[in-house]
């Protein structure tokens, strides 16, 4: 992106840090620390005025102390090395209470947190750099949980739940846009969100939200009053509308092997007067992830070829999908033996052709749609329901909703 205009207020949009994330029992903290160090340098070098994090700061509601240390160290260093504000909303992985607990202390460090949506729409508006002379307004709408959107009732059907959730989301953004209009702001309004926009590309590492994806919304839901909508939840950087006004920044690192080909980035927004000019900054790869699909006959050769690929700053992690093999333990032992001493680490070995998981006969191959479903429990449950011929459609719908509510609580 070109040099910052003299009269611009520069906002950086990022999301889905997932601090404390594990991949096959391996910590991602080394990569996350490198990312946060890099991010801090970009804030200083690019003269960023505000960093906007659109949810999923942490990977769990109760993150490990080491993950909290990464977060608070970044807050402190950002405050020490720059004059930028830090603006954060909670995502579906975050605990709203945990994020907001130190809210008053963080405010003294120019850090503004909204874990739960404010009851009064006017209270969702953050004016930067100051309320007296704002250059941009941030409409802080965090992840909207079911209790924020509808009154749950037993026996509700999927179509009813979907309609109520989508209407609840629409209402939250319309109320916020109306509050911004009532405030008679002379500056652009940037809205935040942590949700699923219908048609956007997902990966295997996103957890179902709004009871199994029932709350996917159309891009047209967001009022035109918002000059830009900074989204989190989906890990692939992408725009969801033709104008590029509604965007996911994506996660800063690949959080699963399904994201290995994603080009990670942060978004830059130069607010000049009433206009918002967009740009992006590519994020370096701190550790390469690689999925090796091979056969028993080609295994040794393919592992040797992998060893020739230059690693990033941290050693490469590999997932091996092996076809033409019948025993996982035996396959795992062979892969471990052949990869010993190589400049990469094999995290996981999977069989590419195994019997169907549910209702399969001997020799039947796995349905391609089942690949990776262990990370998507609601889809596994849906697959199980399809095998139950004695259940009515109404019974299946009720069971599906009950299961997804259970998953949402975990």
Predicted regions mapped to residue ranges:
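N-terminal active-site segment of His-dependent metallophosphoesterases
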Residues: 1-76, 83, 401, 405, ...
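Accessory, non-catalytic peripheral segments of nucleic-acid enzymes
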Residues: 5-6, 45, 271-410
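Divalent metal-coordination and catalytic microenvironments
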Residues: 16, 36, 56, 71, ...
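Alpha-helical scaffolding segments of alpha/beta enzyme cores, especially the outer helices
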Residues: 38, 69-77, 101-104, 171, ...
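Short beta-strand segments at enzyme active-site cores
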Residues: 49-55, 86-90, 188-192
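His/Asp/Glu-rich metal-coordinating catalytic cores
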Residues: 63, 90-243
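A short helix->loop->beta-strand "cap" motif at the edges of active sites that frequently abuts
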Residues: 80-86, 187, 244
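Binuclear metal-dependent phosphoesterase catalytic core
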Residues: 122-136, 141, 246-310
């Amino acid at each position: 992106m070109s040099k910052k205009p003299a009269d611009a207020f520069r906002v950086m949009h990022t999301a889905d840090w997932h601090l404390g994330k594990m991949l096959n029992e391996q910590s991602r903290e080394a990569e996350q620390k490198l990312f946060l160090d890099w991010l801090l340098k970009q804030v200083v070098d690019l003269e960023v005025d505000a960093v906007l994090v659109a949810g999923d700061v942490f990977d769990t509601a109760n993150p490990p102390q080491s993950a909290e240390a990464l977060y608070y160290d970044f807050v402190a260093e950002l405050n020490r090395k720059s004059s930028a504000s830090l603006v954060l909303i909670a995502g579906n992985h975050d605990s709203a209470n945990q994020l907001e607990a130190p809210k008053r202390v963080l405010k003294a460090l120019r850090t503004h947190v909204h874990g739960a949506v404010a009851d009064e729409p006017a209270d969702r508006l953050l004016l930067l750099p100051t309320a007296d002379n704002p250059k941009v307004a941030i409409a802080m709408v965090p992840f909207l949980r079911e209790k924020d959107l509808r009154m749950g009732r037993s026996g509700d059907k999927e179509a009813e739940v979907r309609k109520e959730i989508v209407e609840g989301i629409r209402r939250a953004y319309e109320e916020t846009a109306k509050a911004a209009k009532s405030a008679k702001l002379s500056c652009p309004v940037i809205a935040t969100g942590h949700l699923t926009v219908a048609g956007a590309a997902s990966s295997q590492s996103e957890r179902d939200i709004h009871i199994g994806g029932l709350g996917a919304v159309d891009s047209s839901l967001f009022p035109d009053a918002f000059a830009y909508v900074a989204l989190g939840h989906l890990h692939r950087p992408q725009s969801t509308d033709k104008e590029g006004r509604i965007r996911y920044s994506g996660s800063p690192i690949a959080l699963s092997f399904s994201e290995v080909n994603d080009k990670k980035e942060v978004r830059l927004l130069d607010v000049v007067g009433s206009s918002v000019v967009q740009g992006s900054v590519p994020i370096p790869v701190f550790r390469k992830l690689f999925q090796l699909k091979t056969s028993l006959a080609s295994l040794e050769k393919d592992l040797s070829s992998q060893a020739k690929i230059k690693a990033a700053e941290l050693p490469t992690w590999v997932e091996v999908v092996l076809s033409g093999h019948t025993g996982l333990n035996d396959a795992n032992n062979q892969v471990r033996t052949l990869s010993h001493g190589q400049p990469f680490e094999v995290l996981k070995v999977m069989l590419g052709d195994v019997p169907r998981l549910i209702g399969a006969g001997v020799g039947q191959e796995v349905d391609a749609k089942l690949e990776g479903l262990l990370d998507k429990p609601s889809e596994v449950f849906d697959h199980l329901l399809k095998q139950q011929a004695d259940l009515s459609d109404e019974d299946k719908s009720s069971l599906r909703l009950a299961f997804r509510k259970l998953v949402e609580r975990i």
